[in-house]
Amino acid sequence: IRRQRQMCIRDRVNDPSVPPNLCFPGKEEVAALVAEITGKKMASVENVTAAVRCSRLDGNVKKQLDYIGYSTCSAAALAYGGPWACKFACLGFGDCVSACPFDAMVLVDGMPQVDPVACVGCGSCVRTCPKGIIELIPSQARVWVPCSNRDSAKAVKAVCEVGCISCRMCVKVCPAKAVTLEEGIIRIDHKKCLDYGTGCDEVCVEKCPQKIFRYYQPAALADKEKRAEAA
């Protein structure tokens, strides 16, 4: 079996259709080596970071039941979707934390927090989350939406104070056309957002009625405040 696995990996690495930059932990150094060994064209490596799209604590999401069982997210998800009234909420048992091979995640008040310095974007947490609410987004992203709820506005407000209500305001005001509503959830084309630059003044954040469209990193907020002072 081990020999077969090695041959499978070798075939994948040598496959011309497979780019040489898929080893996120290895970043550009490993990508360059793979490209050199296989004769493939070097492709840039985008640094990505895990992001948990849930604001259960901010939204004061209540419990729908008291879960008694194995203290894992995978087990809790089988019990009527978990203990929280929002069926898209982070379950809070830390399966993602346990799965992270780089110790880049930790539970704080029952919610996973990501260390952006330690996170290499390997995606182990993404694959582990039974709710599918963890995504990999560019480390330089300016904005994001920490909510995965796909229900109607009425249903969202019944369980969460800050959840996305799919009002499409962000979609309408984004001059870069970087924001879309797909299958009930807001998606951001971060390349379009970053390429457009700060000229939009992050209007998506300002116009969001739920204040769930937020700055992704402190640097983006600091830059916004600096521009406001200079105006």
Regions found by a protein language model. Name each.
Residues 13-14, 38:
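Generic structural signal for hydrophobic core residues of well-folded globular domains
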Residues 20-98, 102-113, 139-150, 154, ...:
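Fe-S ferredoxin-like electron-transfer domains
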Residues 16-28, 33, 79-80, 117-128, ...:
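Short microdomains enriched in Cys/His and/or Lys/Arg
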Residues 4, 192, 212:
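Ca2+-coordinating acidic residues in Ca2+-binding motifs
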Residues 6, 15-16:
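Eukaryotic low-complexity, mixed-charge intrinsically disordered interaction/regulatory segments enriched
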Residues 9-13, 95-113, 120, 124-141, ...:
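Iron-sulfur cluster-binding cysteine motifs and their immediate structural context
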Residues 1-9:
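Single conserved hydrophobic/aromatic residue that forms the stacking wall/gate
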